[in-house]
From Swiss-Prot:
The keyword Ribosomal protein does not apply. One of its GO terms (biological process) is tricarboxylic acid cycle. The keyword Ion transport does not apply. This is Probable malate:quinone oxidoreductase. InterPro entries: FAD/NAD-bd_sf, MQO. It is an enzyme of class 1 (oxidoreductase). It catalyses: (S)-malate + a quinone = a quinol + oxaloacetate.
Amino acid sequence: MFISEAIGPEDRFDAVLIGAGIMSSTLAVLLHELDPCMRILIVERLDSPALESTSAFNNSGTGHAANCEFNYTPLQSNGRIEIEKALSINSSFERSLEFWASLAEMGRISPATFLNFLPHISFVWKEADLDFLKQRYLQLSSEVAFQRMEWSDDKAELKEWMPIVMQGRPTSEKVAATRIQRGTDVDFGALTRAYFDSLEESGSVHIRLSTEVIDIQRFGQDPWKLFLKSDLNSYCVEGKFVFLGAGGGALSLLQKSGIPEGKFYGGFPVSGQWLVCNETQVTNNHNAKVYGNADVGSPPMSVPHLDTRWIRGRKSLLFGPFAGFNTKFLKYGSNWDLFRSIQMGNVGAMVQAGLENIDLIKYLYGQLQQDHISRVDSLQNFLPNAKSKDWHLSLAGQRVQIIKKTSKGGKLKMGTEMVSSSDGSLAALLGASPGASTAVAIMIDLLRSSWGEKMSTKIWQDRLRRLIPSFGEDLNSNESMLKATRDRNDSLLGFGEKNQ
């Protein structure tokens, strides 16, 4: 047992962030820019940052702006399409671009190392989906954020938008697509490493790799004590504030903290796989992110897409994701993760959520039965001329969907949720999509809830507006501000200078 007196000043921190992924690194950069003297510790159990969900191959989608993802615009029972989530995600991603633009202007990061621009396309070929896409286009394009969206059912034009997608299609097939040319591909692994390179030069931010959090405790109103274990030794550090940003590992850490707010949460792990193509004769002929619509009855996570990705500078095509199931909460986790997470407070909610999501379980079972031939068959809905030999299977990351006890029983949630202690001294980010692309907006919300007093000071307000000039404004209702923000972002990040 460690006692407070055994902890030296070098192991006392203003903030301790668990997990060296995009969430913790974003929060660390924000805190450091707002208070350069703040002592921050980042703890990562693996030997390098960004190896779990932040890694580009592990991340289900990059450059999320709700331009083309159907799961953010569901069809309602009244025949209307719900677009509020798409508007929220789009403005959140613009905040991320704004933040990166400011850091680039200050020389902290280089956009060329992690950011590429390419069109985002929604593509359909079924009769019911044609009507859905047209209505989606009409509703979204009436909003300022999406007013540059294009729609077409002209096959000649669509062949210009996505040549290899249109090759080999039956002449009688009806197709349609929408396009937003101002789309992005983001290598969040590269961005995270760039964040850490900048932070390590500060002297006030410390990163400890190959270090695992064994326990988290707090006595009264004292700082949090975190018991750590590295390859060399075991020791304890103190943190006035703790952020659990360990992806799928955040739930178990939240449970260890013992805060009552985390008592009724559980998790349902879902693994993923991609078909990957690195053949230049294929990759050179496709430069877009193309999203289709999920089959009727399939869960939102099943939305198929053909992604152009630049990963560590190399252009690849990824198709999927194909879902799977195992009991790990992290890609490099333990098969006991799910079982260890079951407690008296969440077992009822987990059982009820399972019973209410039999269709999801059936879907996952079906995905597990697929072989390479059946996966390529799915790919050929997008690329009729795709050749099996050009594509190989790659294991993606783990996502842990939130199971939450509510007044109506256990519910499975598909988004992200921040769980905080009543005094704001500890916060955990649970869930998955859209995740990385909205990290800046998520972390600003965390600052409001956990650092509210400092957030109200003039110095923090001024520094935030230096980082995010539109801070405090609603971009979806302020057309002139949105235009000015996008013009600035495009100029500083280099939109139009490449991939066009």
